UniProtKB/Swiss-Prot annotation:
Family per similarity comment: Belongs to the GTP cyclohydrolase IV family.
GO molecular function, one term: GTP cyclohydrolase I activity
EC annotation from Swiss-Prot or TrEMBL: 3.5.4.16
Function: Converts GTP to 7,8-dihydroneopterin triphosphate.
Record carries keyword Hydrolase: yes
Protein's name according to its UniProt entry: GTP cyclohydrolase FolE2
Catalytic activity: GTP + H2O = 7,8-dihydroneopterin 3'-triphosphate + formate + H(+)
Length: 292
């Protein structure tokens, strides 16, 4: 058995099984290597979407930098074997500047670059990240940072936008109307997780504060908003407001829908509320879909 010098890194590597590289016969320069993806012949079917998922990149949501998780795709004609996936990252890098701004205009520019680099007609992106924003306590007006989850979806075909979506997930307080009605005092309440997926008009300019308008519809219709910081006067106000505004999951999604239906820049929406029930071992939920 060969003995290696364990005082060196190379010796330890070989001791654990590493071997020296062999003298190969295949090309080592890019121009000489076979490019299988670029093979052209009849591959039977065109592909609607092919690309990469779970690409994590820095993004900017308003004034805060956070991590975005991306899914990028392009179309592929039936006479092409595959796409060059490294060009997807190259397309992203062309628009990177201490983070990619999570706005539809920026994502549209990224997709246009992707179209050009991939030489395909269609391209799409979905990206999720944390949205951080200033939140003030209701009575003492102390500022802290709140958050919600956002997911942008955008797709283009040629110069036409074919899909434009925004999903927001936020947490609220819901107080049970039945518990309040039947009890001499108090009522059980819990944290509710509200998810709103909006389908945005592709041919109309969107309002500047669209995220805040959607979030307001989600939170204002709940029994209470959640706050990062609450002093005693704030906690009193939050508790009393929840008692004044009891909500079933059914109530909440209907009230949110009543606000969203008034936004002329929306073509439709899906709403789900899931209550993490404080007196049960199960959750309660309700879903609603609406198209104009």
């Amino acid at each position: 058995m060969t003995e290696f010098d364990l005082s060196t890194r190379e010796g330890r590597w070989k001791h654990f099984g590493s071997v020296d590289p062999i003298e190969g016969t295949k090309p080592t320069t890019k121009n000489e290597m076979t490019d299988l993806q670029s093979t052209h012949k009849d591959f039977l079917f065109e592909i609607e979407e092919v690309g990469i998922k779970n690409l994590v990149y820095p993004v900017l949501v308003d004034q805060y930098q956070t991590a975005g998780t991306f899914s990028f795709s392009t179309s592929l004609t039936k006479d092409e074997k595959g796409i060059n996936m490294s060009r997807i990252i190259e397309s992203v890098e062309k628009h990177y500047d201490n983070g990619i701004e999570l706005e539809f205009n920026t994502l549209y520019q990224v997709l246009c670059t992707l179209q050009t680099n991939m030489k395909q007609n269609a391209a799409g992106v979905d990206v999720s990240g944390k949205w951080f924003f200033d939140r003030y306590s209701p009575t003492t007006n102390i500022k802290a940072v709140g958050n919600a989850d956002v997911t942008y979806g955008l797709a283009i075909d040629g110069d036409k936008v074919t899909r434009k979506e925004l999903t927001i997930e936020a947490t609220v307080t819901t107080l049970c109307p039945c518990s309040k009605e039947i009890s001499e005092y108090s009522a059980h309440n819990q944290r509710g997780v509200v998810t709103v997926k909006t389908y945005i008009n592709k041919d109309q300019d969107i309002v500047d504060d669209y995220k805040n308008k959607i979030l307001d519809a989600m939170e204002a219709n709940a029994s209470s908003i959640l706050y990062p910081i609450l002093k005693r006067p704030d906690e009193k106000r939050v508790t009393e407001r929840a008692y004044e505004n009891p909500r079933f999951v059914e109530d909440l999604i209907r009230l949110i829908a009543a606000d969203l239906v008034e936004f002329d820049w929306l073509e439709g929406f899906d709403i789900e509320c899931r209550n993490e029930e404080s007196i049960h071992q199960h959750d309660a939920f309700a879903k609603l879909k609406y198209r104009k």
